[in-house]
From Swiss-Prot:
Transit peptide, residues from-to: 1-34
One GO CC term on file: mitochondrial matrix
Pfam families: Cpn60_TCP1
Cell location: Mitochondrion
Gene name of the record: CPN60I
Protein name stated in the entry: Chaperonin CPN60-1, mitochondrial
TM annotation in the entry: none
Length: 577
């Protein structure tokens, strides 16, 4: 009996040990799924973050102004990239130190936000972010209240934006548009004039795209086309990973006014596209469930170039937009109102065009195959509807449709002697085009950073609730001097001297022409900046840098140490020669 009890106890211990081993093993397996974290606090955290901000900003700021330098960026494949575009430089920088990288990533966020909103001004935003955060760190280290500093910064930015809006003037002439484009293209007059011509051809609200040219020279080509303000439904449809766009050459275009959910509804049109060896674009109210899955699987596994886009607009406006698209591409709208559906449509109901480019936000259809006479008749119907309409909203929508149907698309073809040169010029043309659109939208202010410099003088009058908020205002006041300082320094002149001389006089149009090395009337000379670009750069920079100033701890992953590779085994015996 004793032996039986001992045997049972032994088995229980073994079972317990086995269970404990399994529990420890499961805990180890669970912990392996989570990386260890490192936490930095207070001054140390902000100092490390500041180092990342400063190093990134120093790399970006060398591109600023007419005498700014190029930056050469190593790429994982192909030749190095040469650029003067601030956001391109910022995006390329990664630090080994995780905390430094947090600071750099937040500056990249500023540059990206400014680029997305205004299309230009990324270098200015980066320089301002560094200036505000540097002063903010010093103030917090000296014992200032971080939240009061942030309130002061916010008050100062609001006051400066109001001042800039009062300083702005609208532009309208082709010459003024060319001046804005020239400044944003780093003084290349040819690019400014090319953009002005493109806007003249398709209107200020028209669609202008940028493409690689086939010659040494820049060219302007106007192609009849239409832009839809809807992008691809799924990123799986992307065909160009570099531009994050789906590009389809000579596609079949299916236009449907209802949702597409059934797999069988898209199989027929996919087979048709495969048979004709052509890409496929589907424009419908929506594509979801089985239908969307079928399209994605055929794109990924069968290699069929396909893309689905939601139809633009709502209700009757959507139907009208689809009808416009059908006439432009020579197809028909497959609608149940006329007894048609996706199971019984005929091949002649599909439209086509020369090229379709789909981004996450919009779709550009170039050179539709529709009958010219039908397109002109449709445009005339819209013009008549505009004349007869009494609603401002309806008129606006009708004018949008008319512009899309008959305005066309201007293509700026950028030429050069090498791929690197074309890439660098395309970066500058993109900045110039975005800046020009921003200038037309909100107006212009004197360029070269002087608008911000003169706005800083107005902050002397700003009333604050306490001393710490006053310091926040002074941080912005000092930061607003950095764009002029940086542009002058890049031109080989003492920046502090230029800033001091400009602040001494009262003419708010006077500035420093870094290209010629003289003080001039910036507006008369054509050195101007779009208000939207300057405003967005300041607001984004102040927002992120003031948040960084209030940071008290940073949590980052501790990099895993890779185990060394095992040594190679010995050779087989008898293999010596």
């Amino acid at each position: 009996m004793y032996r039986a009890a001992a045997s049972l106890a032994s088995k229980a211990r073994q079972a317990g040990n086995s269970l404990a081993t399994r529990q420890v093993g499961s805990r180890l397996a669970w912990s392996r799924n989570y990386a260890a974290k490192d936490i930095k606090f207070g001054v140390e955290a902000r100092a490390l973050m500041l180092r990342g901000v400063e190093e990134l900003a120093d790399a970006v700021k060398v591109t600023m102004g007419p005498k700014g330098r190029n930056v050469v960026i190593e790429q994982s494949f192909g030749a190095p990239k040469v650029t003067k575009d601030g956001v391109t430089v910022a995006k390329s920088i990664e630090f080994k130190d995780r905390v430094k990288n947090v600071g750099a990533s937040l500056v990249k966020q500023v540059a990206n936000a400014t680029n997305d909103t205004a299309g230009d001004g990324t270098t200015c935003a980066t320089v301002l972010t560094k200036a505000i955060f540097t002063e903010g760190c010093k103030s917090v280290a000296a014992g200032m209240n971080a939240m009061d500093l942030r309130r002061g910064i916010s008050m100062a930015v609001d006051a400066v934006v109001t001042n800039l809006k009062g300083m702005a003037r609208m532009i309208s002439t082709s010459e003024e548009i060319a001046q804005v484009g020239t400044i944003s293209a780093n003084g290349e007059r040819e690019i400014g004039e090319l953009i002005a011509k493109a806007m003249e051809k398709v209107g200020k609200e028209g669609v202008i795209t940028i493409a690689d040219g086939n010659t040494l020279y820049n060219e302007l080509e106007v192609v009849e086309g239409m832009k839809l303000d809807r992008g691809y439904i799924s990123p799986y449809f992307i065909t160009n990973s570099k531009t994050q766009k789906c590009e389809l050459e000579d596609p079949l275009i299916l236009i449907h006014d209802k949702k597409v959910t059934n797999m069988h509804a898209v199989v027929k049109v996919l087979e048709m596209a495969l048979k004709k060896q052509k890409p496929l674009l589907i424009v419908a109210e929506d594509v979801e469930s089985e239908a969307l899955g079928t399209l994605i699987i055929n794109k990924l596994r069968a290699g069929i170039k396909v893309c689905a886009v939601k139809a633009p607009g709502f209700g009757e406006n959507r139907k009208a937009n689809l009808q416009d698209l059908a006439i432009l591409t020579g197809g028909e709208v497959i609608t149940e109102e006329l007894g048609m559906n996706l199971e019984n449509f005929e091949p002649h109901m599909l439209g086509t065009c020369k090229k379709v480019t789909v981004s996450k936000d919009d779709t550009v259809i170039l050179d539709g195959a529709g009958d010219k006479k039908s397109i002109e008749e449709r445009a005339e119907q819209i013009r008549s509807a505009i004349e007869n309409s009494t609603s401002d909203y309806d008129k606006e929508k009708l004018q949008e449709r008319l512009a899309k149907l008959s305005g066309g698309v201007a293509v700026l073809k950028i030429g050069g002697a090498s791929e690197a040169e074309v890439g660098e010029k395309k970066d500058r043309v993109t900045d110039a085009l975005n800046a020009t659109k921003a200038a037309v939208e909100e107006g212009i202010v004197p360029g070269g950073g002087v608008a911000l410099l003169y706005a800083s003088k107005e902050l002397d009058k700003l009333q604050t609730a306490n001393f710490d908020q006053k310091i926040g205002v002074q941080i912005i006041q000092n930061a607003l001097k950095t764009p002029v300082h940086t542009i002058a320094s890049n031109a080989g002149v003492e920046g502090a001297v230029v800033v001091g001389k400009l602040l001494e006089q009262e003419n708010t149009d006077l500035g420093y022409d870094a290209a010629k090395g003289e003080y001039v009337d910036m507006v008369k000379t054509g050195i101007i900046d779009p208000l939207k670009v300057i405003r967005t750069a300041l607001v984004d920079a102040a927002s992120v840098s003031s948040l960084m100033t209030t940071t008290e701890s940073i949590i980052v992953e501790i990099p895993k140490e890779e185990a060394p590779a095992p040594a190679m085994g010995g050779g087989m015996g008898g293999m010596d020669y």
